[in-house]
Protein backbone atom coordinates (compact mmCIF):
# COMPACT_ATOMS: atom_id res chain seq x y z
CA UNK A 1 0.00 0.00 0.00
CA UNK A 2 1.35 3.41 -1.00
CA UNK A 3 2.25 5.96 1.64
CA UNK A 4 -0.26 8.81 1.27
CA UNK A 5 1.26 12.05 2.56
CA UNK A 6 -0.43 15.30 3.55
CA UNK A 7 1.42 17.01 0.68
CA UNK A 8 -0.11 14.60 -1.84
CA UNK A 9 -3.59 15.29 -0.47
CA UNK A 10 -2.93 19.04 -0.63
CA UNK A 11 -1.72 18.80 -4.23
CA UNK A 12 -4.77 16.80 -5.28
CA UNK A 13 -7.07 19.29 -3.57
CA UNK A 14 -5.41 22.17 -5.44
CA UNK A 15 -5.75 20.37 -8.76
CA UNK A 16 -9.36 19.30 -8.34
CA UNK A 17 -11.01 21.51 -5.73
CA UNK A 18 -12.37 18.38 -4.04
CA UNK A 19 -12.63 17.97 -0.26
CA UNK A 20 -9.75 16.68 1.85
CA UNK A 21 -11.35 13.34 2.75
CA UNK A 22 -12.40 12.73 -0.86
CA UNK A 23 -8.85 13.42 -2.00
CA UNK A 24 -7.36 11.10 0.59
CA UNK A 25 -9.77 8.31 -0.35
CA UNK A 26 -9.01 8.80 -4.05
CA UNK A 27 -5.27 8.49 -3.41
CA UNK A 28 -5.75 5.38 -1.29
CA UNK A 29 -7.97 3.76 -3.92
CA UNK A 30 -5.45 4.52 -6.70
CA UNK A 31 -2.37 3.67 -4.60
CA UNK A 32 -1.02 7.20 -4.71
CA UNK A 33 -1.20 7.67 -8.50
CA UNK A 34 -2.02 11.38 -8.89
CA UNK A 35 -3.43 11.16 -12.43
CA UNK A 36 -5.57 8.14 -11.60
CA UNK A 37 -6.73 9.90 -8.45
CA UNK A 38 -7.84 12.87 -10.54
CA UNK A 39 -9.73 10.51 -12.85
CA UNK A 40 -11.24 8.78 -9.81
CA UNK A 41 -12.54 12.10 -8.47
CA UNK A 42 -13.85 13.12 -11.88
CA UNK A 43 -15.70 9.84 -12.14
CA UNK A 44 -17.16 10.34 -8.68
CA UNK A 45 -18.07 13.88 -9.65
CA UNK A 46 -19.84 12.67 -12.74
CA UNK A 47 -21.71 10.09 -10.66
CA UNK A 48 -22.74 12.88 -8.30
CA UNK A 49 -23.79 15.01 -11.21
CA UNK A 50 -25.95 12.23 -12.58
CA UNK A 51 -27.61 11.88 -9.17
CA UNK A 52 -28.43 15.59 -9.19
CA UNK A 53 -30.17 15.28 -12.53
CA UNK A 54 -33.48 14.25 -10.94
CA UNK A 55 -33.79 17.67 -9.34
CA UNK A 56 -35.86 20.31 -11.11
CA UNK A 57 -33.85 22.97 -12.91
CA UNK A 58 -36.36 25.80 -13.35
CA UNK A 59 -34.13 28.84 -12.88
CA UNK A 60 -31.34 29.93 -15.21
CA UNK A 61 -30.95 32.46 -18.00
CA UNK A 62 -31.50 33.11 -21.67
CA UNK A 63 -28.88 34.48 -24.03
CA UNK A 64 -28.87 35.90 -27.55
CA UNK A 65 -25.85 36.35 -29.84
CA UNK A 66 -25.37 36.82 -33.58
CA UNK A 67 -22.85 37.26 -36.37
CA UNK A 68 -23.23 38.58 -39.92
CA UNK A 69 -25.39 35.70 -41.10
CA UNK A 70 -26.79 33.80 -38.13
CA UNK A 71 -28.19 34.35 -34.64
CA UNK A 72 -29.04 32.08 -31.75
CA UNK A 73 -31.30 32.41 -28.73
CA UNK A 74 -31.06 29.76 -26.04
CA UNK A 75 -32.16 28.90 -22.51
CA UNK A 76 -29.94 27.17 -19.96
CA UNK A 77 -31.51 26.07 -16.68
CA UNK A 78 -30.15 25.73 -13.15
CA UNK A 79 -31.88 24.92 -9.87
CA UNK A 80 -31.57 28.27 -8.08
CA UNK A 81 -31.56 31.93 -8.96
CA UNK A 82 -28.35 32.26 -6.93
CA UNK A 83 -26.42 30.02 -9.32
CA UNK A 84 -28.00 31.73 -12.33
CA UNK A 85 -26.29 34.95 -11.20
CA UNK A 86 -22.95 33.17 -10.74
CA UNK A 87 -20.12 34.27 -13.09
CA UNK A 88 -19.16 30.66 -13.85
CA UNK A 89 -22.73 29.85 -14.89
CA UNK A 90 -22.96 32.95 -17.07
CA UNK A 91 -19.66 32.05 -18.76
CA UNK A 92 -21.04 28.57 -19.41
CA UNK A 93 -24.17 30.01 -21.03
CA UNK A 94 -22.07 32.30 -23.23
CA UNK A 95 -19.81 29.41 -24.27
CA UNK A 96 -22.82 27.26 -25.18
CA UNK A 97 -24.34 30.08 -27.22
CA UNK A 98 -21.08 30.57 -29.15
CA UNK A 99 -20.84 26.83 -29.76
CA UNK A 100 -24.36 26.60 -31.16
CA UNK A 101 -23.86 29.72 -33.28
CA UNK A 102 -20.69 28.19 -34.75
CA UNK A 103 -22.00 24.64 -35.33
CA UNK A 104 -25.72 25.35 -35.87
CA UNK A 105 -26.98 21.87 -34.90
CA UNK A 106 -30.43 20.70 -36.01
CA UNK A 107 -31.62 19.50 -32.61
CA UNK A 108 -30.89 19.56 -28.89
CA UNK A 109 -29.69 15.97 -29.11
CA UNK A 110 -27.25 16.89 -31.89
CA UNK A 111 -26.07 19.96 -29.97
CA UNK A 112 -25.11 17.89 -26.92
CA UNK A 113 -22.95 15.64 -29.11
CA UNK A 114 -20.98 18.45 -30.79
CA UNK A 115 -17.38 19.08 -29.80
CA UNK A 116 -16.37 22.24 -27.96
CA UNK A 117 -13.07 24.04 -28.81
CA UNK A 118 -11.42 22.28 -25.82
CA UNK A 119 -12.28 18.84 -27.25
CA UNK A 120 -15.13 18.03 -24.85
CA UNK A 121 -18.62 17.30 -26.08
CA UNK A 122 -21.23 19.82 -25.01
CA UNK A 123 -22.76 17.16 -22.74
CA UNK A 124 -19.42 16.51 -21.00
CA UNK A 125 -18.81 20.25 -20.71
CA UNK A 126 -22.16 20.69 -18.95
CA UNK A 127 -21.56 17.65 -16.73
CA UNK A 128 -18.22 19.05 -15.60
CA UNK A 129 -19.91 22.36 -14.81
CA UNK A 130 -22.53 20.53 -12.72
CA UNK A 131 -19.72 19.01 -10.67
CA UNK A 132 -18.00 22.36 -10.12
CA UNK A 133 -21.10 24.47 -9.50
CA UNK A 134 -22.99 21.84 -7.51
CA UNK A 135 -26.39 22.13 -9.16
CA UNK A 136 -28.17 20.39 -11.97
CA UNK A 137 -27.70 22.39 -15.19
CA UNK A 138 -29.34 21.71 -18.53
CA UNK A 139 -29.36 23.18 -22.00
CA UNK A 140 -33.12 23.32 -22.38
CA UNK A 141 -33.74 24.75 -25.83
CA UNK A 142 -32.37 26.94 -28.59
CA UNK A 143 -33.28 28.36 -31.98
CA UNK A 144 -30.93 29.41 -34.77
CA UNK A 145 -31.98 31.95 -37.40
CA UNK A 146 -30.37 32.89 -40.71
CA UNK A 147 -30.73 36.23 -42.47
CA UNK A 148 -30.24 37.60 -45.97
CA UNK A 149 -28.23 40.74 -46.78
CA UNK A 150 -31.13 43.21 -46.64
CA UNK A 151 -32.26 42.04 -43.20
CA UNK A 152 -31.62 42.73 -39.53
CA UNK A 153 -31.48 40.76 -36.31
CA UNK A 154 -32.88 42.32 -33.16
CA UNK A 155 -31.58 41.09 -29.81
CA UNK A 156 -33.01 41.96 -26.41
CA UNK A 157 -32.27 40.56 -22.96
CA UNK A 158 -34.57 41.52 -20.09
CA UNK A 159 -33.92 41.24 -16.34
CA UNK A 160 -30.39 39.80 -16.64
CA UNK A 161 -31.49 37.02 -18.95
CA UNK A 162 -34.88 36.22 -17.46
CA UNK A 163 -36.36 36.87 -20.91
CA UNK A 164 -34.48 36.68 -24.20
CA UNK A 165 -35.89 37.75 -27.56
CA UNK A 166 -34.55 37.40 -31.10
CA UNK A 167 -36.30 39.10 -34.02
CA UNK A 168 -35.66 38.93 -37.76
CA UNK A 169 -36.73 41.81 -40.00
CA UNK A 170 -36.55 41.77 -43.80
CA UNK A 171 -36.41 44.82 -46.06
CA UNK A 172 -34.27 46.82 -43.63
CA UNK A 173 -30.83 46.61 -42.04
CA UNK A 174 -31.83 48.91 -39.17
CA UNK A 175 -30.82 46.96 -36.06
CA UNK A 176 -32.25 49.68 -33.81
CA UNK A 177 -35.74 49.04 -35.17
CA UNK A 178 -35.21 45.28 -34.87
CA UNK A 179 -34.08 45.68 -31.25
CA UNK A 180 -37.03 47.95 -30.44
CA UNK A 181 -39.39 45.26 -31.72
CA UNK A 182 -37.57 42.66 -29.62
CA UNK A 183 -37.99 44.86 -26.54
CA UNK A 184 -41.71 45.22 -27.28
CA UNK A 185 -42.05 41.44 -27.59
CA UNK A 186 -40.27 40.94 -24.26
CA UNK A 187 -42.75 43.28 -22.56
CA UNK A 188 -46.04 42.39 -24.28
CA UNK A 189 -45.50 38.73 -25.27
CA UNK A 190 -47.52 38.48 -28.51
CA UNK A 191 -48.40 35.01 -29.80
CA UNK A 192 -48.24 35.73 -33.52
CA UNK A 193 -46.71 38.18 -36.00
CA UNK A 194 -50.03 39.02 -37.68
CA UNK A 195 -53.66 38.03 -37.33
CA UNK A 196 -53.31 36.03 -40.56
CA UNK A 197 -51.06 33.64 -38.63
CA UNK A 198 -53.84 32.70 -36.20
CA UNK A 199 -55.33 29.32 -37.07
CA UNK A 200 -58.96 28.98 -38.14
CA UNK A 201 -59.50 26.60 -35.21
CA UNK A 202 -58.34 29.19 -32.68
CA UNK A 203 -60.47 31.92 -34.24
CA UNK A 204 -63.56 29.70 -34.23
CA UNK A 205 -62.95 28.62 -30.65
CA UNK A 206 -62.61 32.22 -29.48
CA UNK A 207 -65.73 33.14 -31.43
CA UNK A 208 -67.71 30.43 -29.62
CA UNK A 209 -66.46 31.62 -26.23
CA UNK A 210 -67.26 35.26 -26.98
CA UNK A 211 -70.71 34.35 -28.31
CA UNK A 212 -71.53 32.44 -25.15
CA UNK A 213 -70.26 35.34 -23.04
CA UNK A 214 -72.53 37.77 -24.86
CA UNK A 215 -75.55 35.46 -24.53
CA UNK A 216 -74.85 34.99 -20.81
CA UNK A 217 -74.86 38.76 -20.42
CA UNK A 218 -78.47 38.68 -21.63
CA UNK A 219 -77.79 40.63 -24.81
CA UNK A 220 -80.45 40.41 -27.54
CA UNK A 221 -79.58 37.91 -30.27
CA UNK A 222 -79.70 40.62 -32.94
CA UNK A 223 -76.73 42.49 -31.42
CA UNK A 224 -74.72 39.49 -30.21
CA UNK A 225 -73.14 39.01 -33.64
CA UNK A 226 -71.88 42.61 -33.77
CA UNK A 227 -70.57 42.39 -30.21
CA UNK A 228 -68.70 39.18 -30.98
CA UNK A 229 -67.24 40.69 -34.13
CA UNK A 230 -65.90 43.68 -32.19
CA UNK A 231 -64.52 41.59 -29.33
CA UNK A 232 -62.91 39.11 -31.72
CA UNK A 233 -61.19 41.95 -33.55
CA UNK A 234 -59.88 43.25 -30.20
CA UNK A 235 -58.67 39.76 -29.22
CA UNK A 236 -56.79 39.29 -32.50
CA UNK A 237 -55.12 42.69 -32.15
CA UNK A 238 -54.00 41.80 -28.62
CA UNK A 239 -52.23 38.59 -29.65
CA UNK A 240 -50.83 39.80 -33.00
CA UNK A 241 -47.54 41.71 -32.88
CA UNK A 242 -48.19 43.95 -35.89
CA UNK A 243 -51.54 45.16 -34.49
CA UNK A 244 -50.29 45.96 -30.98
CA UNK A 245 -49.67 49.57 -29.88
CA UNK A 246 -45.89 50.04 -29.91
CA UNK A 247 -44.59 50.27 -26.32
CA UNK A 248 -42.29 53.22 -27.07
CA UNK A 249 -45.02 55.10 -28.94
CA UNK A 250 -48.57 53.80 -28.31
CA UNK A 251 -49.96 56.17 -30.96
CA UNK A 252 -48.76 53.78 -33.67
CA UNK A 253 -48.80 50.00 -34.02
CA UNK A 254 -45.68 47.84 -34.19
CA UNK A 255 -46.51 47.10 -37.83
CA UNK A 256 -46.60 50.81 -38.64
CA UNK A 257 -43.34 51.44 -36.78
CA UNK A 258 -41.51 48.70 -38.70
CA UNK A 259 -43.01 49.84 -42.01
CA UNK A 260 -41.46 53.29 -41.49
CA UNK A 261 -38.04 51.69 -41.98
CA UNK A 262 -39.22 49.77 -45.04
CA UNK A 263 -39.08 46.49 -43.15
CA UNK A 264 -41.32 43.64 -42.14
CA UNK A 265 -41.13 41.22 -39.19
CA UNK A 266 -40.65 37.71 -40.57
CA UNK A 267 -39.97 35.83 -37.33
CA UNK A 268 -39.43 36.20 -33.61
CA UNK A 269 -38.47 33.91 -30.74
CA UNK A 270 -39.21 34.77 -27.12
CA UNK A 271 -37.80 32.56 -24.36
CA UNK A 272 -38.69 33.13 -20.71
CA UNK A 273 -36.75 31.15 -18.13
CA UNK A 274 -38.68 28.24 -16.68
CA UNK A 275 -41.88 28.72 -18.68
CA UNK A 276 -43.69 25.42 -18.86
CA UNK A 277 -41.55 23.83 -16.13
CA UNK A 278 -43.38 22.77 -12.99
CA UNK A 279 -41.32 23.71 -9.96
CA UNK A 280 -40.95 21.07 -7.29
CA UNK A 281 -42.44 22.26 -3.99
CA UNK A 282 -40.84 20.34 -1.14
CA UNK A 283 -42.68 20.01 2.17
CA UNK A 284 -40.72 22.12 4.69
CA UNK A 285 -41.05 19.59 7.53
CA UNK A 286 -39.94 16.76 5.26
CA UNK A 287 -37.01 18.86 4.08
CA UNK A 288 -35.85 19.49 7.65
CA UNK A 289 -36.26 15.82 8.58
CA UNK A 290 -34.32 14.73 5.50
CA UNK A 291 -31.42 16.92 6.64
CA UNK A 292 -31.60 15.59 10.22
CA UNK A 293 -31.43 12.00 9.00
CA UNK A 294 -28.24 12.62 7.00
UniProtKB/Swiss-Prot annotation:
GO cellular component annotations, sorted alphabetically?
Answer: cytoplasm
| Pfam families (UniProt xref) | EF_TS
Record's subcellular location:
Cytoplasm
Top-level division of the source organism's lineage: Bacteria
**Does the record bear Protein biosynthesis in its keywords?**
yes
One GO MF term: translation elongation factor activity
Keywords from the named record: Cytoplasm, Elongation factor, Protein biosynthesis
Residue ranges of the region described as Involved in Mg(2+) ion dislocation from EF-Tu: 80-83
Query: Which CDD domains does this chain map to?
Result: UBA_EF-Ts (cd14275)
The family classification in the record reads: Belongs to the EF-Ts family.
* PANTHER family documented for this protein: ELONGATION FACTOR TS, ELONGATION FACTOR TS, MITOCHONDRIAL
Functional summary from the UniProt entry: Associates with the EF-Tu.GDP complex and induces the exchange of GDP to GTP. It remains bound to the aminoacyl-tRNA.EF-Tu.GTP complex up to the GTP hydrolysis stage on the ribosome.
**What is the protein named?**
Elongation factor Ts
Which classification does the entry list for the species? Bacteria, Bacillati, Bacillota, Bacilli, Bacillales
Q: What gene, per UniProt, encodes this protein?
A: tsf
Amino acid sequence: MANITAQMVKELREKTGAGMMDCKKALVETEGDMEKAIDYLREKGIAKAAKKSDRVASEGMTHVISNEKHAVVLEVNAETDFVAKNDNFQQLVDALAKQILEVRPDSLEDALKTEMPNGQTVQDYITEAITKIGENISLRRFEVKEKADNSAFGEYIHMNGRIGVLTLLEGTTDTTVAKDVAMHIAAINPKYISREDVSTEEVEHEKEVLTQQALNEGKPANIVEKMVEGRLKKYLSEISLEDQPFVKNPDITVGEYVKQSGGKVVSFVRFEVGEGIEKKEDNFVEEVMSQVKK
